[in-house]
Amino acid sequence: MKIEGSDQLGGEQPQRQPLPPESMAQRQLERLLAKAPESDLFERWQQGAPLEGLLAVVAPAAKRELLWQIYQQGNKPAPEIGKQLFAPVTDKLIARFGERQSPVLDAIDLPELRATMREFDPLASRREKVLLNLLSELRDGQGAVPAEHLFLDALARRELMTLIPLNGMVDNLMRNSHKLDLEA
């Protein structure tokens, strides 16, 4: 017996479609949640645990996260922490872009810079701090940029022209999203 609108015979059950595979993002989230014991590192550091001991037993991503939390507190060890955070990125950027010649080609150079920066940290606000630190390190004693680093200086400035307004908008959204804009 055939039912209208169906190509199936009456006694057969329609075949079930296989469920779509789990999304990659969902699997990554589950993996990150499974590694949650590292989330109390900052509290343990505040309670007096030695920083070297905490950093010795965790994954590189957790190390970086703990160092950023300590750096953002602005306490006494912040300059040493800043060196640990900024030195690897600065060294890689200087090695990769230090000897290139101007002009900066936005379509080629900026995506390469962004990809290099994302290897170290995906957050735009942290990349902004790293680039500002890079600009200060590129300057010599008189405040001038050496000729071999002019390209990297221009490239970092171009990226900061994007990052600073972007981070400002995100900051405004986070701070003022609960307020109504009645003037608009």
From Swiss-Prot:
Protein's UniProt keywords contain DNA damage: no
UniProt keyword Secreted present: yes
One annotated Gene Ontology cellular component of this protein: type III protein secretion system complex
Gene Ontology biological process terms in this record: protein secretion by the type III secretion system
InterPro entries assigned: T3SS_YopR, YopR_core
Subcellular location: Secreted
Region (Disordered): 1-25
Induction comment from the UniProt entry of this chain: Part of a gene cluster encoding T3SS structural components.
One Pfam family here: T3SS_needle_reg
UniProt keyword terms in alphabetical order: Plasmid, Secreted, Virulence
Main localization (coarse): secreted
Assigned protein family: Belongs to the YopR family.
Annotated function: May be involved in the regulation of the assembly of the type III secretion system (T3SS), also called injectisome, which is used to inject bacterial effector proteins into eukaryotic host cells. May control the polymerization of the needle.
Protein name, UniProt field: Probable type 3 secretion system regulator AscH
